[in-house]
């Protein structure tokens, strides 16, 4: 079960395919708007379709488009205001309506032997596992394990985090966890008690669910240990749970998202371009994002490929500009820049670029690092500043301050550095080779199935495997929402 943007859900497609390749039957529960993405990725490939169940009510994209509070919070990188925006009653109602549909499907049509869910659907995934009396796995794209004094908390900037004494560093993680368990995704008392007849979750139970410590649950961190090694103050067992990013290969992405004739021609026409893409982020305004990108490219005389993203960047936005250089930007765009409206196969595109400018989302960062091409990160909020700092520390790119404060001069300077610093480019290439040797989705799939088979070899099979309609565990296990 996965909730969120494409960046939150796409890794679960990779995991679903990896589980399917190992003989598991899989049903993916995700926002209905991801159905086309799922079908697009899988249909052209020589393998069975993923069994997809679309959750129709909650859409992060629609929430961003329709709610000015949420949109402004993202624009300014204000996490607290963002949480305030998504704490509205209608957000909770939509979440629980989708959760109810998922649970009904699990009970009546797909009696899974194991439930896998992401952090944005943690309470609902854990409840589904509780009702079905099966084991579960929490997959996190962030380092949301035990409180650590060595892993920057997502609540504050990494720079501020490292200035704090150790006990306060851990305290920020406790505060972050408390903030999350009082978010709408955990306010499900009405659903659990009135609809399902379960006891309400206590604070300690919510905390266990959030940290992946709930009964019968295991935690997987979908990050490369080369990028995010487990903090040394995590428990020994937890340090082994950083398994690698869940990535669809370049071949899979190209078959799913065939590069357009225009993109191929643009890449072949001259020197490698600079890629600029901010994914699902909308910062300040789409016009600001576009003019920032164009002014930086123009100042350096570089060609660029710009991803339209959720901000819907396009040349038409320049019609809204009253800036004195708007005609120069329009001309530069027409001659030197290609804006791609649809999703781009990052694993194929990034290695053909001279540099990569992006927002620091977990999936984009993983693909950028795997490409061996240095990047500039302009983070907005949540885990993006932390990933920007990690890229800085590895010396394979430059992480800037939050997007809303980045100037043309700052971004141009950073981009110039990653384009010309040969030592940095060499480090990026070496790291990229190492990361490409990893297969986090396959490792995670093996881990999940091994654990499921181990459970079935013990007393667990007497409790849950014998329920009516259960799949044969260990032969062809049914994994729900992987």
Please identify what each model-predicted range represents.
Residues 305, 309, 315-359, 363-364:
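Donor nucleotide-activated moiety binding/catalytic core segment of transferases
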Residues 32-303, 315-332, 426, 430-433, ...:
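Nucleotide-sugar-dependent glycosyltransferase catalytic domains
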Residues 8, 117, 342-389:
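A donor-sugar binding/catalytic signature common to diverse glycosyltransferases
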Residues 27, 305, 376:
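Conserved beta-strand positions in the Rossmann-like core of class I SAM-dependent methyltransferases
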Residues 1-51:
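N-terminal subdomain of nucleotide-sugar transferases
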Residues 18, 37, 127-128, 296, ...:
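Hydrophobic/aromatic ligand-binding patch that stacks against planar heteroaromatic rings
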């Amino acid at each position: 079960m996965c909730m969120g943007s494409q960046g939150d859900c796409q890794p679960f497609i990779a995991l679903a395919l990896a589980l399917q390749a190992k003989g598991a039957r899989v049903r993916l529960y995700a926002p209905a708007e991801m159905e086309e993405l799922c079908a697009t990725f899988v249909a052209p490939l020589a393998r069975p379709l993923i069994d997809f169940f679309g959750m129709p009510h909650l859409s992060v994209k629609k929430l961003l488009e329709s709610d000015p509070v949420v949109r402004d919070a993202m624009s300014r990188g204000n996490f607290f205001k963002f949480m305030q925006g998504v704490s509205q009653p209608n957000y909770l109602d939509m979440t629980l309506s989708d959760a109810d549909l998922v649970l009904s499907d699990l009970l009546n049509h797909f009696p899974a032997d194991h439930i896998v869910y992401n952090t944005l659907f943690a309470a609902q995934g854990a409840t589904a596992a509780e009702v079905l009396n099966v084991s579960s796995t929490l997959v996190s794209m962030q380092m949301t394990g035990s409180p650590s004094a060595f892993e920057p908390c997502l609540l504050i900037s990494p720079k501020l985090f490292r200035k704090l004494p150790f006990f306060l560093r851990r305290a920020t993680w406790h505060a972050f966890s408390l903030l999350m368990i009082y978010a709408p995704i955990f306010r499900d008392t009405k659903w659990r008690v009135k609809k399902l007849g379960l006891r309400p979750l206590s604070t300690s139970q919510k905390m266990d669910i959030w940290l992946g410590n709930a009964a019968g649950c295991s935690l997987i961190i979908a990050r490369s240990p080369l990028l995010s090694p487990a903090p040394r103050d995590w428990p020994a067992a937890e340090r082994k749970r950083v398994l690698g990013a869940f990535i669809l290969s370049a071949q899979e992405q190209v078959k799913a998202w065939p590069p357009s004739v225009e993109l191929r021609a643009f890449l072949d026409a001259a020197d490698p371009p600079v890629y600029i893409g901010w994914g699902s982020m909308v910062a300040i305004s789409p016009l600001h994002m576009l003019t920032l990108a164009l002014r930086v490219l123009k100042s350096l005389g570089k060609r660029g490929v710009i991803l339209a993203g959720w901000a819907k960047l396009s040349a038409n936005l320049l019609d809204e500009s009253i800036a004195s250089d708007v005609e120069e930007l329009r001309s530069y765009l027409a001659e030197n820049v290609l804006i791609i409206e649809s999703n781009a196969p990052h694993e194929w595109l990034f290695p053909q670029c001279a540099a990569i400018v992006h927002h620091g989302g977990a999936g984009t960062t993983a693909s950028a690092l795997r490409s061996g091409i240095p990047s500039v990160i302009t983070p907005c909020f949540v885990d993006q500043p932390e990933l920007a700092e990690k890229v800085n520390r590895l010396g394979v790119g430059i992480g800037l301050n939050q997007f809303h404060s980045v100037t043309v001069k700052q971004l141009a300077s950073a981009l110039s550095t990653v384009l010309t610093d040969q030592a940095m480019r060499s480090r990026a290439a070496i790291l990229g080779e190492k990361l490409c040797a990893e297969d986090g989705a396959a490792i995670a799939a093996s881990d999940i199935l091994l654990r499921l088979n181990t459970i079935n070899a013990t007393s667990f099979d007497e409790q849950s495997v014998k329920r009516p309609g259960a799949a044969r565990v260990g032969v062809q296990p049914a994994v729900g929402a992987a």
